[in-house]
Amino acid sequence: MSKVASKLNLRQVGRVCVTVADTDRAIDFYVGTLGFEKVVDTPMGPDMRWVEVALHGTPTTIALAPPPQGQGAGGSQTGIILDTSDVDADHAALKAAGVDVDDEVTRFGGPVPPMFWLRDPDGNSLIIVQPSA
């Protein structure tokens, strides 16, 4: 362990942040479509809100935040990976609901699990993966 690391008090990944142009639209997508729960919704200055959503029973949240001043919202590869027990069923359900998903589930084979990408209404990409049992 490095000299710096031994002095730190880090304990978990608490939240990740995606920028969104319309907070209510993002809440509708993450809560209404993906099944997250809204766990934080608080004013952030006179015109903005800080919102966090999480999957039921999980400690890590996704913050749905406005972009920094002068920057656009969304359009990023978030690096967020959501685990599922049935990647094919989730892909079919999201595609049928009109969510922007890849045309097919990607299957690389070997130790790489099946997966597909989806994009939220702001173009932020998330990956849904079915880990090996």
Language-model segments: what does each one mean?
Residues 55, 64-66, 130:
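Residue-level recognition of conserved beta-strand positions in structured domain cores
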Residues 1-9, 15-18, 41-42, 49, ...:
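Vicinal oxygen chelate
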Residues 22-23, 84-88:
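Helix N-cap motif at beta-to-alpha junctions
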Residues 4, 39, 67-70:
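Short, P/G- and charge-enriched loop/turn segments at secondary-structure junctions
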Residues 8-10, 17-60:
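Core segments of cupin and vicinal oxygen chelate
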Residues 29, 88-93:
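Short amphipathic alpha-helices within nucleic acid-binding modules
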Residues 56-61, 69-71, 87-89:
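Short, charged/polar surface micro-motifs in flexible loops or helix N-caps
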Residues 66, 73-74, 80-84:
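Helix-adjacent hinge/juxtasegments
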